[in-house]
């Protein structure tokens, strides 16, 4: 099957040089990146969390960029049949395909165009933040003048039905209060709040629904965008993805999840516990149904015993009360607005949030890097939080990212070393994730990609 797709969404014009950049060549990493992300988009809504399995299932899929005088078209060769209805591509997928093209081309151009950006230094914290801003601005995700109303929702892709229905109820309550949603774009706790908010917005006749899906090339195939996403944004790596979340958020809700959710919480606490951010207003709520109370108790104990009692003041745990979660978020929006106005910061992008370089620099989850993490208590808590975040990030890679899966197949499990008490609590937390099926989607046995060494 070969079909041609016209542009829809936020990109409809490419220069001739940009098209040539994406022309298929056997050695083109850029083409492979574009192809794999496009395939993930066309599998939107599919229940998989194994990027290697998805990519191998569609080995005969190809995509070409065709240059036309009036713009550009995409040629799809052997695409997934589920992306089409009566021979026509689903419009949301059509828009998301061009979002992939937009973001991958833009990031490549920003990084490699030394004429337009001669001084871009990706080892410089300020430059990294400006790149994150540029990607979001190019995606038209930063709406000037809009009052704060963007709630970022984090949580696992592999959650049980009770947790899914609860996250949907929270989303409905947020939607009834005309709040918009940003998630990691995949299934589970990333889809449920959007689904609930869509109903809430419809009930209120709210016409400006924004369901932002923020992803990255290395995970999009393991977590294909859910069908509710109407603004897909692809950040270059997990660190820039996390920074984008935090800088566009006016409030953050964390639902039950696995190692990826723990990584997100530790990343955020590493920022909020930095003394430079003591005046920031960013409400953070951890919530789930009553069946998840034990999950949050264990997570809370892990945070307190590794980062100290002071970490607790940066978040609130609300169990089994969807309306209260939404009320607290809505009540916080004027406070966020006042804080941004008082500091002269933008409503759409939090420039004043201080993010330490060790939270911004990409972490390569190699076996050597994982073994060399400094997981000891005799250091500033924000530094320990950053290394704990890296440890969980490596486990995410070993679980679902193609590069991590291949490394585990070749060299065996990651070995994680550190303080005996921290290692014991980390092992308890991870064993709980395994027992509760939070590492993999139900139906597939989980084989640990790590060993805790004490």
Curated annotation (Swiss-Prot):
InterPro entries per record: LOG_fam, LOG_family_nucleotidases, PpnN, PpnN-like_sf, PpnN_C, PpnN_N
GO molecular function: AMP nucleosidase activity; guanosine tetraphosphate binding; identical protein binding; inosinate nucleosidase activity; pyrimidine-5'-nucleotide nucleosidase activity
Highest taxon of the lineage: Bacteria
Reactions accelerated catalytically: a pyrimidine ribonucleoside 5'-phosphate + H2O = a pyrimidine nucleobase + D-ribose 5-phosphate; AMP + H2O = adenine + D-ribose 5-phosphate; GMP + H2O = guanine + D-ribose 5-phosphate; CMP + H2O = cytosine + D-ribose 5-phosphate
A GO CC term attached to the entry: cytosol
Entry's Gene Ontology BP terms: protein homotetramerization
Assigned protein family: Belongs to the LOG family.
UniProt xrefs under PANTHER family: CYTOKININ RIBOSIDE 5'-MONOPHOSPHATE PHOSPHORIBOHYDROLASE, PYRIMIDINE_PURINE NUCLEOTIDE 5'-MONOPHOSPHATE NUCLEOSIDASE
Role according to the record: Catalyzes the hydrolysis of the N-glycosidic bond of diverse pyrimidine and purine nucleotide 5'-monophosphates, to form ribose 5-phosphate and the corresponding free base. Can use AMP, GMP, IMP, CMP, dTMP and UMP as substrates. Cannot catalyze the reverse reactions. Is required for optimal growth in glucose minimal medium, possibly because it contributes to nucleoside pool homeostasis by degrading excess nucleotides and feeding back the ribose moiety to catabolism.
Protein name per the record: Pyrimidine/purine nucleotide 5'-monophosphate nucleosidase
Annotated organism of origin: Escherichia coli (strain K12)
